[in-house]
Amino acid sequence: MTEAQRHQILLDMLAQLGFVTVENVIERLGISPATARRDINKLDESGKLKKVRNGAEAITQQRPRWTPMNLHQAQNHDEKVRIAKAASQLVNPGESVVINCGSTAFLLGREMCGKPVQIITNYLPLANYLIDQEHESVIIMGGQYNKSQSITLSPQGSENSLYAGHWMFTSGKGLTADGLYKTDMLTAMAEQKMLSVVGKLVALVDSSKIGERAGMLFSRADQIDMLITGKNANPEVLQQLEAQGVSILRV
């Protein structure tokens, strides 16, 4: 039996058992203790197994960290990363946050992952990521799965009133002096029902959407506590929003 054949049999044993002793290897391969230890050492050096006292164990394959496939192709990705980082700094330990769907929402959830905050979401890609990363406190809002948005929606919207947060972070397809616009009516209507039970509403809108109208009006400008946007946002619209009491943070 060649060395390569011995190595393959040893690895097959580990794949089945997870752990083998030097004695197991000697008996299975009919080789001397010195040869068994030498084979284990070589496979350990090549990273194919982990050498332990009196034997070897299989290397546990870590699950790849989940992230949306197209996240880095999202429009204005770098700006959205800055927006998410700034938003995460608003939240204090022990507080709860509602995070809705979209690329900026995912980036924000990623920033908050591992911090002592409760994250409430109906966005399944974010929920999956948080669970995969073992975030301590995740609440997934119930309802019917909406494939196009990768979210859950309560058909009557009544369940959303059960959830309350210190902060609600949301985005949209446009923001003007009139307010924040969203294009998906079902999503917008479900989120609207939560506006009365959250402490502060923060709009996360990249600069390309400032001054744009698209879809339905989700919230009036005077309902928005803070806007976090990019430095290239339309200054005229920002002034109009500030005049209505919206706090502006440009990043």
UniProtKB/Swiss-Prot annotation:
It is found in: Cytoplasm. Residues 20-39 bind DNA. It holds the Pfam family HTH_DeoR. One of its GO terms (molecular function) is DNA binding. It comes from Salmonella arizonae (strain ATCC BAA-731 / CDC346-86 / RSK2980). Gene3D superfamilies: Winged helix-like DNA-binding domain superfamily/Winged helix DNA-binding domain. One of its GO terms (cellular component) is cytoplasm. Keywords: Cytoplasm, DNA-binding, Repressor, Transcription, Transcription regulation. It comes from the Bacteria. This is HTH-type transcriptional regulator UlaR. The keyword Transcription applies. Residues 3-58 form the HTH deoR-type domain.
